[in-house]
Curated annotation (Swiss-Prot):
Upper classification of the organism: Bacteria, Pseudomonadati, Pseudomonadota, Betaproteobacteria, Nitrosomonadales
Binding site for ATP: K539
CDD domains linked: Anticodon_Ia_Val (cd07962), ValRS_core (cd00817)
Coiled coil: 859-924
SUPFAM superfamilies: Anticodon-binding domain of a subclass of class I aminoacyl-tRNA synthetases (SSF47323), Nucleotidylyl transferase (SSF52374), tRNA-binding arm (SSF46589), ValRS/IleRS/LeuRS editing domain (SSF50677)
Gene Ontology cellular-component terms listed: cytosol
The reaction(s) this protein catalyses: tRNA(Val) + L-valine + ATP = L-valyl-tRNA(Val) + AMP + diphosphate
Functional description taken from the UniProt entry: Catalyzes the attachment of valine to tRNA(Val). As ValRS can inadvertently accommodate and process structurally similar amino acids such as threonine, to avoid such errors, it has a 'posttransfer' editing activity that hydrolyzes mischarged Thr-tRNA(Val) in a tRNA-dependent manner.
InterPro entries: aa-tRNA-synth_I_CS, aa-tRNA-synth_Ia, Anticodon_Ia_Val, M/V/L/I-tRNA-synth_anticd-bd, Rossmann-like_a/b/a_fold, tRNA-bd_arm, tRNAsynth_Ia_anticodon-bd, Val-tRNA_synth_C_sf
Major localization class: cytoplasm
Subunit structure of this chain's protein: Monomer.
UniProt-recorded name of the protein: Valine--tRNA ligase
């Protein structure tokens, strides 16, 4: 099979992926690489939203999961990477509602059943987008087992869990405070609320004492407490004013009452340690129905909450008549105006505050007192904590266990109901007296109700409820399946730190409760992919990258259109276009999936934030080209020739052969350790350095010398080493760069006496310590140092690459004689003269261990001195420019960090060059 002259990722990626999937290579057991008796290895894909498209975070984590999957599959494990998607209740419902809006259709007019039919229709048409994109990245999931959280089997598991928890007394319905999105009109989880600092106001309002304590003569303001608030509209629901019990200013007033402005109510002055005496006036309004902290204070002081908002964010009929029906922000404006009119608004100050907004609607989220379904968490949390404390579940890096523990030690009951139509409908029914009957289906509920007429609860379950069951529901639970026995606990969960509580902890608790097993043995927490400057990637910032654009490339106009369409604030389009044109004047070139995967792996350290630099993609695309060209060289020199495959033929391994074979063993050891430690960056670095720095840059050059030696045995051994080391290196790199390694392996494998249909079914390389030859490794280290020294001498003497000159060398004669062919070829020498001592001359001398080296050339000392002096002056001028720039605080403070760092690197480079120039001048006697 002849290789193309250049590496074309697009040509090979689709061809190989369709073959891998079509042949069933991604499946565990006999259909894959390992039998049922092999050790089980399983990874659960965190199910992306069915509405979603592949973003950089997905692509990053999927690369790591696929690398682990391919690695363990090649190691002979019975390997399953379980894929699937999440129904994403809120996100999906919004997408379909927006489509209906474009047709001027309201879902409420359509009705629940018809709307759900539309959602399912959309899911079938568009729901597989992210799965197709994962395939482009090379994900070797078992797609035959792909699951969806609303599938029949998974839905049955959800119902079973709800019913069991309810009957165990762990699920209840109650009125509590929740995050409420008034646009969606549903409760939302903390993860669906994004808080950001915004400019606002702090209003200081006078709450008059109920009984005049100091008089109100001559039209003066009544006496009272001045309360500071950022939300005057909620004062209509105030039930108390709180002060700190140790605040001397107000201690004598505790137990008294104030009149609630604009309302005909009296509320108490209470003492609570929660109050910060330094904030505002030290007096805080307490609105238990519309603030989470106030709710807790209200519970402590037995205050009855008074909700004053409707579900769509308007003032309800429990407030004074003049505010009823007003939108909450219109009510705020009217309340402030009325307070001012009644001389009760003391002052208004600008104030920065954290404003919580729904991540889907951008609407300000309201704490709202509503009836919801809850899971009692304390007992479940205890078992979850024990699992980590005992080591049954291990976090990597270890510090994330602390975050997990903090969440579970301070856990609250879990609100699991959502006021949506799309999702798992809560399996609870009500009779006319509002009695609740929880059952697996309507028929069972009617039996429990004695045949009475029942109506099912309208709410659906929080998406995280079904996601919490993912590790065991996808394996067939509640049925007792072979997959459940084989693959649970799964091996590792690869996920982000932002969902340690929302997903990771809940999976641990649910799996322990229902299966008696932990869901996974290890949790590898990845960092967050950010842009090159360290900023979070977001549509509004205009710095989002599409992984497929990095694979296929994208023209500048198309990139601008993609970045500026669908903005929440269209006014940002101009600045985003400007930034994009500056960053990508030629658009984004095609790097291919392998280069992108290798980039992600190289970035996968144990840090919290990961800066994505596209220059790395370019570097790893160059790596792929280098590997491709190395394979072409090996094929051209080995195909149709004797590569030592017959055992009886004589072989004669040189130090260079033994060195590269030994270095391969060291690389295999290091890569295996890196996978064990989840240090994908170390695995990538080791593979890169071995292939590029040692095999390509050094061994191929040594091999050229050996192939030109005229010695048939040396040539045969060299070809054998070339082919076998390359074939092994391809297997070593395959989990990270699967496409190019498969394409090359098909051609290289026969030269190394390897047979098989695919590289992904081959055994993963394992180090053989007996192949380490310390003597050869030491000799080649010395040879490389001598070659580099000769190259440095050539540079110092300003010799052109085409100019070949003799070398005078002093040292061990046998060693120099052995090194001679390599030195002549790689250092471009015409001859090597081994001397007892070097002659006195102005030419520079290199000392390498016990060896002394000098190039035998005549030097025009005056001309060389003049050249070096001019170069020294130039470098000093450049150094001064760089020093001036770095001393300028405007430059250092305002220029991008990357630019400042580049300037520092330039200065360091000039400093090094200056030292070398001075050293050369000194050798010339200057």
């Amino acid at each position: 099979m002849e290789l193309e002259k250049s590496f074309d990722p697009r040509a090979i990626e689709s061809r190989w992926y369709s073959r891998w999937e079509g042949e069933g290579y991604f499946r565990p057991g006999p259909a894959g690489t390992a039998g049922d008796q092999a050790p089980a290895y399983c990874i659960m894909l965190p199910p992306p939203n069915v509405t979603g498209t592949l973003h950089m975070g997905h692509a990053f984590q999927h690369t790591l999961m696929d690398a682990l999957t391919r690695y363990h599959r090649m190691r002979g494990d019975n390997t399953l990477w379980q894929p699937g998607t999440d129904h994403a209740g809120i996100a999906t419902q919004i997408v379909v509602e927006r489509q209906l809006d474009q047709q001027s259709i309201d879902r409420r007019d359509l009705g629940r059943e018809a709307f759900l039919a539309r959602v399912w229709e959309w899911k079938e048409e568009s729901g597989s987008t992210i799965s197709r994109q994962m395939r482009r990245m090379g994900a070797s999931c078992d797609w035959s087992r792909e699951r969806f959280t609303m599938d029949g089997g998974l839905s049955r598991a959800v119902t079973e869990v709800f019913v069991r928890l309810y009957r165990e007394g762990l699920i209840y319905r109650g009125e509590r405070l929740v995050n409420w999105d008034p646009v969606l009109q549903t409760a939302v989880s903390d993860l669906e609320v994004v808080s950001a600092e915004e400019e606002g106001s702090l209003w200081h309002i006078l709450y008059p004492f109920e009984n005049d304590l100091g008089g109100n003569q001559d039209g003066a303001k009544p006496e009272g407490l001045i309360v500071a608030t950022t939300r005057p509209e909620t004062m209509l629901g105030d039930m108390a004013v709180a002060v700190h019990p140790d605040d001397e200013r107000y201690r004598h007033l505790i137990g008294r009452h104030v009149r609630l402005p604009l309302c005909e109510r009296s509320i108490p002055i209470i003492a609570d340690a929660y109050v910060d005496p330094a904030f505002g006036t030290g007096c805080v309004k307490i609105t238990p129905a519309h603030d989470f902290n106030d709710y807790q204070i209200g519970q402590r002081h037995k205050l009855v909450p008074l909700g004053i908002l409707t579900l769509d964010g308007k003032i309800n009929d429990l407030a004074p008549a003049e505010y009823q029906g007003l939108d909450r922000f219109a009510a705020r404006r009217k309340i402030v105006a009325d307070l001012e009119e009644q001389n009760l608004l003391v002052e208004t100050k600008p104030h920065k505050l954290m404003v919580p907004r729904g991540d889907r609607t951008q609407a300000i989220v309201e704490p709202m007192l509503t009836d919801q379904w809850y899971v009692t968490m304390n007992g479940l949390a205890r078992r979850g904590l024990e699992a980590v404390a005992s080591g049954e579940v291990k976090f990597i890096p270890e510090n994330w266990a602390h975050v997990y523990n903090q969440w579970l030690e301070n856990i609250q009951d879990w609100c699991i109901s959502r006021q949506l139509w799309w999702g798992h409908r809560i399996p609870a029914w009500y009779d006319e007296d509002n009695n609740i009957f929880v059952a697996h289906n309507l028929e069972e509920a009617q039996r429990l109700a004695g045949g009475r007429k029942l109506v099912q609860d309208e709410d659906v379950l929080d998406t995280w409820f079904s996601s919490a069951l993912w590790p065991f529901s996808t394996l067939g639970w509640p049925e007792k399946t072979p997959e459940l026995d084989t693959f649970l606990p799964t091996s590792v969960l690869v996920t982000g730190f932002d969902i340690i509580f929302f997903w990771v902890a809940r999976m641990v608790m649910m799996s322990l409760h229902f299966t008696g097993k932990v869901p996974f043995r290890e949790v590898y927490i990845t960092g967050l992919i950010r842009d090159a400057e360290g900023h979070k990637m977001s549509k509004s910032r205009g710095n989002v990258l599409d992984p497929l654009d990095l694979i296929d490339g994208i023209a500048l106009p198309d990139l601008i259109t993609k970045r500026t369409s669908g903005l929440m604030n269209p006014r940002q389009a101009e600045s985003i276009e400007k930034i994009t044109r500056k960053q990508f004047p030629e658009g984004i070139p095609a790097f291919g999936a392998d280069a992108l995967r290798f980039t992600f792996a190289s970035l996968a350290s144990h840090g919290r934030d990961i800066k994505f630099d596209m220059q790395r993609c370019e570097g790893y695309r160059n790596f792929c080209n280098k590997l491709w060209n190395a394979a072409r060289y090996v094929l051209m020199n080995c195909e149709g020739k004797d590569t030592g495959l017959v055992e009886s033929v004589p072989l004669e391994y040189s130090d260079a052969d033994c060195w590269i074979i030994g270095r391969l063993q060291q690389a295999e050891t290091a890569v295996a350790q890196a996978y064990q430690d989840y240090r994908f960056d170390m695995a990538a670095r080791e593979i890169y350095e071995f292939v590029w720095d040692e095999y390509c840059d050094w061994y191929l050059e040594f091999a050229k010398v050996q192939l030109n030696s005229g010695n048939e045995v040396v040539q045969r051994t060299t070809r054998r080493t070339l082919a076998r080391v390359l074939e092994t290196a391809l297997r070593l790199a395959h989990p990270l760069i699967p496409f190019i390694t498969e394409e090359l392996w098909q051609s290289v494998a026969p030269l190394a006496a390897k047979q098989g249909v695919s590289i992904m079914l081959q055994p993963y390389p394992q180090a053989d310590p007996s192949k380490l030859d310390d003597t050869a490794i030491g000799n080649i280290a010395a040879l490389k140092e001598m070659i580099n020294a000769c190259r440095t001498l050539r540079g110092e003497m300003n010799l052109s690459p085409a100019s070949r000159v003799p070398l005078l060398a002093v040292g061990d004669v046998k060693t120099l004689a052995g090194f001679s062919p390599y030195l002549k070829a790689l250092a471009k020498l015409s001859d090597i003269e081994i001397e007892q001592d070097l002659p006195p001359a102005e030419a520079p001398v290199a000392i390498v261990g016990e060896f002394r080296l000098m190039l035998k050339i005549e030097i025009d000392i005056a001309a060389e001195r003049e050249r070096l002096t001019k170069e020294l002056d130039r470098v000093q001028t450049e150094m001064e420019k760089a020093q001036t720039k770095l001393a300028n605080s405007n430059f250092v403070d305002r220029a991008p960090a990357k630019v400042v760092e580049q300037e520092k690197e330039r200065l360091a480079g000039f400093s090094t060059t200056l030292g070398k120039l001075k050293e050369q001048l000194q050798k010339l006697g200057c």
